[in-house]
A protein has these predicted regions:
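Short loop/turn segments immediately following beta-strands, especially the blade-tip
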Residues: 1, 46-53, 92-102, 149-158, ...
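Short glycine/acidic-enriched loop and turn motifs that connect beta-strands
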Residues: 31-37, 86-89, 143-145, 193-195, ...
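Residue-level detector of Asp-centered blade-edge/turn motifs that repeat once per structural unit
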Residues: 20-23, 73-77, 131-132, 181-183, ...
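Surface-exposed loop and turn segments in beta-propeller and other repeat-based domains
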Residues: 60-62, 105-119, 163-167, 211-224, ...
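Asp-box/WD-like beta-propeller blade repeats and closely related beta-sheet repeat scaffolds
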Residues: 54-126
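Loop/turn-rich, solvent-exposed surfaces of beta-rich toroidal or solenoidal domains
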Residues: 227-293
Length: 329
């Protein structure tokens, strides 16, 4: 079941959120084009009351680009990095001992374009750290690239890897990304052509190599107007991969070959609502929460531990325009 335990914390256009490894702090991007009276978006740090779940604001910083839409915390808990969608840039910040954010320690502007009308400029859409805390991957929808950067968490710095990127299929539009828990594979979901890409990953140098491209729709179906993908996560066991389809209103389920990293289609499960911009898998791997942005609900699904298939529990709770979830362990 899902039970609300804390009230609403007001913030300017909060979207993606992440919890610090200590469980003491939460960070949220402010997806705006003006923040604290200056151009661009922002990022805000909160302290978490572990007993009540209540959030107390610590501080905010500028994102140094319009409409930040994603962020990650490095595995040591020393820095945060974010992706600015409209601004086409990324920025990093050091985390203080009290959980507050420094001013930006690194700002990198992307430049490039591709073939779709939405790809006339760079659009950094997600940023994720690998399991060894050495590299981050940035999906850029506008450039049709997944870029990799070497991470210096202590200093809050990012530097291009060698090679610095892997190309997507032209017009694919890389959106979100997930590393496999065993470290040798990674996966990206492509917003514009409704596909998933499986990658081989060399964590020694941060290199990605495409292995497979597979549809996020049921076999035989093709993209219709108004459809696009959104979120992607690997199951904690590493056995399954999940992605969400907006417009189609489903979660796609794949099984992951543990030797090759390639994907086998399992099913598309309806989300009992519309526009699943995001979802979350609880740390035990038993449940998935689908966030239906257009219908203002969160739907709870049970995960089959043998097949990865989803079963609706019958539980949906109201939530205004849900777009991101993070679990407090």
């Amino acid at each position: 079941t899902l039970t609300r335990i804390a009230g609403v914390t007001k913030s300017a256009e909060p979207s993606f959120v992440a919890v610090h490894p200590s469980g003491k702090y939460l960070y949220a991007v402010n997806e705006t084009s003006e923040f604290m009276g200056k151009p661009g978006g922002g990022i805000t740090a909160y302290a978490i009351d572990r007993l009540t779940g209540t959030l107390t604001k610590l501080n905010s910083q500028l994102s140094h680009g319009d409409h930040p839409c994603h962020l990650m915390i490095d595995r040591s808990g020393r820095c945060v990095a974010l992706a600015n969608y409209t601004g086409g840039s990324i920025a990093a910040y050091k985390i203080g001992k009290d959980g507050s954010l420094s001013e930006a320690t690194c700002i990198i502007q992307h430049s490039g374009s591709s073939i779709d009308p939405r790809q006339q400029s760079a659009h950094a859409h997600s940023i994720d750290v690998d399991l060894n805390n050495r590299f981050v991957a940035v999906s850029d929808l506008g450039m049709d690239q997944v870029l990799t950067y070497r991470l210096n968490a202590r200093k809050g710095l990012l530097n291009p890897a060698d090679p610095p990127f892997v190309k997507a299929v032209p017009g694919a539009g890389p959106r979100h990304f997930a590393f496999h828990p065993q470290g040798a594979f990674a996966f990206g979901i492509n917003e514009l052509d409704l596909t998933t890409t499986a990658y081989a990953y060399d964590g020694r140098v941060g290199k990605l190599q495409s292995l497979q491209v597979i549809s996020t729709l049921p076999p035989g179906e093709t993209k219709q107007a108004g459809q696009s993908t959104a979120e992607m996560y690997v199951h904690p066991s590493g056995k399954f991969l999940y992605g969400s389809n907006r417009g189609h209103h489903t979660i796609v389920v794949y099984q992951i070959d543990q030797q090759t990293g390639k994907l086998t289609y399992v099913e598309n499960e309806g989300t009992h609502g519309e526009t699943p911009r995001s979802f979350g898998i609880d740390p035990t791997g038993r449940f998935l929460l689908a966030l239906n942005q257009s219908t203002n609900t969160i739907a709870l699904f049970r995960i089959n531990q043998d097949t990865g298939a989803l079963e609706y529990t019958g539980t949906s709770v109201p939530c205004p325009a849900p777009v991101a979830t993070a679990f407090l362990r």
